[in-house]
Amino acid sequence: MTDRYVYDLSEGSAEMKPLLGGKGAGVAEMKRLGVPVPDGFTVTTEACVDTMTRKGEWPEDLESEVWDGLKRLEERTGRVLGDDKKPLLVSVRSGAVISMPGMMDTILNLGISDDTVEAIAKEAGNERFAWDCYRRFIQMYGEVVEGIDAHIYEDALTALKEKKGVESDTDLSADDLKGLVDTFKKLSNEQLGGNWTTDPREQLMRAVDAVFRSWLNPRAFVYRKANKIPDDLGTAVNVMQMVFGNRGDTSATGVCFTRNPATGEKELYGEFLVNAQGEDVVAGIRTPRSLAEMEEVLPEAYHDLIDTMKKMESHYRDMQDMEFTVENGKLYLLQTRNGKRTAAAALKVARDLVDEGVITKEEALMRIEPAQLDQLLHEAIDPDHSEQPVAEGLPASPGAAVGEAVFDADVAAERGAKGEKVVLIRFETTPDDIHGVIVSQGVLTAHGGMTSHAAVVARGMGKPCVAGARGIKIDAKAATLTIGDTVIHEGDMITLDGSTGEVFASGLKLIPPQINADFQEVLSWACLLYTSPSPRDQRGSRMPSSA
């Protein structure tokens, strides 16, 4: 136990991960290394655990410590939460000790209100940006903190875009967004009986509490059970000054990996969106652009990012998964963590890091979980088939998936639990679909990219995934997938090739797996390192049981 619950960013380090969570410790370590990160503070995992122990009641000193942390942040930034001249806006994000991508909650743009929106617009010289932040905040806060159904906001947004004749949120004007904010406020008050709070300090307290509660939500339980993560670790809460990827054409947000998490190759891998905020990428709301294109759009930030990727992989001696924002051309890092990867990628990365002299063979073996190796023993599509793909998307997670099409995560979970082979098809997956993803043979989405939550979770579980498939139309109510003249109904057979991104409207034949050179090489290390000629050594010789 520590004697306090709140730590400023400058007080943390990578070694404090059990206390500050992965995100808080990772950002603190980046700051220590001179990487540009937003300022902030972290509420510890112990605060969450103590709150759960007290059945949701905060420990006695926690609220005052949060206020003290906020005051110090305000002094460092020269901004004040709720101020109508120089307002402070913050993000409130979860941060588990063991990475759980997308399973817990985030609130962005907290601090924006009727009292501050004009000051934000004036300072930025961009009225549209300010009202975009405001509508995003109301929706995110309403869903996460107040429990308002997401479709209430989404339906209003969709109706506005249809009325204006536009397809993308970015096509809406400042006046359009101002009207949307009024609509969102009205809808929120209707749902809450007029009890929507506008006090940013109260909103901050409730947001921190909502992140604590998200540790206990059903999808988090399902993910922890599937990945054998203890339920008593709790989550930290990171309160950080907002940096904005939605300030215009010189701003962006994205996710990158220092190596390919699907194959393990040492190559550029990532995605970004111009004029967007982070949740747009990881939630799969918009299909992002390849990171390689960023060099043309934001060259200075791109080269800074490449340098930072190299620096962080060298520091952690492992493949990193990083989130970043570019605000008016300046790069900020929001997160770094050891990246989720497929079994094939785990072997490739481990072997290459040994060859590069970064880690030893013993370290490499300890990083490969025995359960992962089972993924390499799955069947593959017979290359001699004559079928033509009906659609192609992004090869988000490799492998072959053959099963009956289903369009609802609950249906997938029910049928999968009976041992039936199903492929989950969604417009975009959300973290709430995790129970359906776990039992499916594979996942197909119409939207989202290779760094969306769907892709990251699928790779970590060894599930084939094709994301952002072009030209497909999904009708969830009718349970149909339409691609040109081809219509796939629920129960029809479908095949996904997560290695190529191809989709086939039939069940293709599968063949036994082929053991690759990386697998053979790593097994040879195990034989050499864990088989000793000494009788005494032989008695204790064994492969490591876990990473």
Regions found by a protein language model. Give the residues of each.
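Short, surface-exposed secondary-structure edge patches
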Residues: T258, A413-R415, I434, G484-V487
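Short hydrophobic alpha-helical runs that function as membrane-insertion/retention elements
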Residues: V37-D39, V443-T445, P464-G468
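Phosphate/diphosphate-binding loops
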Residues: T336, R351, D355-E356, K463, ...
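Nucleotide/phosphate-binding sheet-loop regions of phosphoryl- and nucleotidyl-transfer enzymes
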Residues: M1-H385, E420-V423, T430-H435, Q441, ...
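Conserved small/polar residues in nucleotide/adenosyl-binding loops
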Residues: Y530-D537
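Hydrophobic alpha-helical segments, chiefly the membrane-spanning helices
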Residues: R542-S546
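Protease-associated
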Residues: V358-S440, E502-L510, N516-L529
